[in-house]
């Protein structure tokens, strides 16, 4: 069975795995920054073209552009639900990926060919989160918050456009 073909190790990141020992690596249940740090400490993962199955619990908007800058491409994203929580899983390999828009950094890329029944709910939730952040920053009187506000407004507009686009693509 599957248990004979898999090996599990407890180690700091990928430090306990030699480069030739793995062709597929799953990193799940931690934040996007932690996932990026684990991959940054193991450049052999990209060099060997390992398949990565990543499930960031937070900071997806930091992980996606980090992957792009480091020479990875996101081949596929899949949404799943447990209770009221939506989770994103990324299938990633070494390779070129076009730069992501600010909204795509939050939500991932979408295309007409993507069939995901949770996508509309996901986009709606992200758009609402961005709107709340924009509202909060608009209350700020600190000049240092202006660039963050402008960036979040761009994210919010992009997410709204992605949601509208997604709706028009549905049968």
Task: Give the positions of each predicted feature.
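Active-site segment flanking the S-adenosylmethionine/decSAM binding pocket
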Residues: 15-43
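Glycine-rich nucleotide phosphate-binding loop and flanking beta-alpha elements
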Residues: 32-34, 60, 98
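Core SAM-dependent methyltransferase catalytic element
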Residues: 85-109
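An accessory alpha-helical subdomain
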Residues: 102-171
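C-terminal substrate-binding/active-site "lid" region of AdoMet-derived donor-dependent transferases
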Residues: 40-93
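Short, glycine- and charge-enriched coil/turn segments that flank and shape catalytic ligand pockets
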Residues: 19-20, 46-48, 97-100, 140-147
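S-adenosyl-L-methionine
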Residues: 1-23
């Amino acid at each position: 069975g599957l248990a004979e073909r898999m090996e599990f190790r407890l180690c700091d990141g990928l430090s306990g795995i030699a480069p030739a020992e793995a062709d597929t690596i799953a990193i799940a249940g931690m934040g996007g920054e932690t996932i990026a740090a684990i991959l940054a400490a193991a450049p052999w993962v990209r060099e060997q073209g390992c398949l990565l199955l990543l499930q960031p619990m937070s900071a997806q908007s930091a992980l996606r552009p980090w992957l792009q800058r480091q020479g990875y491409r996101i081949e596929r994203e899949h949404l799943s639900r447990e209770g009221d929580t939506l989770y994103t899983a990324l299938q990633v390999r070494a390779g070129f990926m076009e730069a992501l828009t600010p909204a795509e950094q939050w939500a991932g890329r979408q295309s007409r060919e993507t069939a995901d029944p949770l996508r509309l709910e996901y986009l709606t939730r992200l758009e609402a989160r961005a709107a709340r952040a924009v509202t909060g920053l608009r209350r700020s009187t600190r000049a240092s918050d202006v660039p963050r506000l402008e960036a979040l407004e761009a994210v919010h507009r992009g997410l709204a456009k992605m949601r509208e686009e997604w709706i028009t693509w549905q049968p």
